[in-house]
């Protein structure tokens, strides 16, 4: 604890008591914020882990299927299949406020740039094989999960940063500001009591 460098007057005492009251209230609010952020962070980490396992498992399976399907096609045909984008993805990113942390919310709108009549693929079914078609379709279906995974991971990063900032502020109030204010208030109260006793002694001597 460090006593603040202030004059031991009643005015300073009142000011310090007001500052202490504000600091205590701020400490409670910050602790509540930290605890709620921790709760949200843990929930997001759990969801992230589950979704990441799901996505990674699906990607491994789709990659294996793609390798098998690719073996049935010529390299030129595979290049032609992926030369033209199958779908057009418009990504709109908004933000959501979680305990003063602005986390991303992603919304994807997927269009077939060649019109609904063209279907989901823009290459010839005859030129491809069913395994390739199914693999490409399955990979496309992963897009919402991939976007959600990116959204969660960015949110976790932002919340972790804010939790650390809030933790430092809580500790600063708990272990420095509040103890220093209490120590200074105690010191001023002692000084004022001493002054009152000295004044009383002088008055008694005069009488």
UniProtKB/Swiss-Prot annotation:
Tagged with keyword Repeat: no
A GO MF term: ATP binding
Regions crossing the membrane: none
GO terms (BP aspect): proton motive force-driven plasma membrane ATP synthesis
Keyword Transport among record annotations: yes
InterPro entries listed in its UniProt record: V_ATPase_D
Pfam families according to UniProt: ATP-synt_D
Keywords assigned by UniProt, alphabetized: ATP synthesis, Hydrogen ion transport, Ion transport, Transport
Functional summary from the UniProt entry: Produces ATP from ADP in the presence of a proton gradient across the membrane.
Cited HAMAP family: ATP_synth_D_arch
PANTHER family reported for this sequence: V-TYPE ATP SYNTHASE SUBUNIT D (PTHR11671)
Family indicated by similarity: Belongs to the V-ATPase D subunit family.
Record protein name field: V-type ATP synthase subunit D
Native source species: Streptococcus gordonii (strain Challis / ATCC 35105 / BCRC 15272 / CH1 / DL1 / V288)
Gene that specifies this protein: atpD
């Amino acid at each position: 604890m460090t006593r603040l460098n202030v004059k031991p007057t009643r005015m300073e005492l009142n000011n310090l008591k007001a500052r202490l009251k504000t600091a205590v209230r701020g400490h409670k609010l910050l602790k509540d914020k930290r605890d709620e952020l921790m709760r949200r962070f843990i929930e997001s980490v759990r969801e992230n882990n589950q979704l990441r396992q799901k996505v990674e498992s699906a990607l491994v399976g789709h990659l294996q299927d793609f390798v098998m399907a690719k073996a049935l096609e010529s390299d030129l045909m595979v290049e032609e299949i992926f030369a033209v984008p199958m779908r057009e993805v418009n990504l709109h990113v908004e933000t959501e406020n979680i305990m003063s942390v602005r986390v991303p919310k992603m919304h994807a709108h997927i269009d077939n740039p060649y019109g609904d009549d063209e279907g989901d693929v823009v290459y010839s079914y005859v030129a491809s094989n069913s395994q390739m078609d199914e693999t490409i379709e399955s990979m496309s279906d992963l897009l919402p999960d991939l976007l959600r995974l990116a959204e969660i991971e960015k949110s976790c990063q932002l919340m972790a940063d804010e939790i650390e900032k809030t933790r430092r502020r809580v500790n600063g109030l708990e272990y420095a500001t509040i103890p220093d204010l209490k120590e200074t208030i105690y010191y001023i109260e002692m000084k004022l009591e001493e002054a009152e006793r000295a004044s009383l002694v002088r008055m008694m001597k005069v009488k």
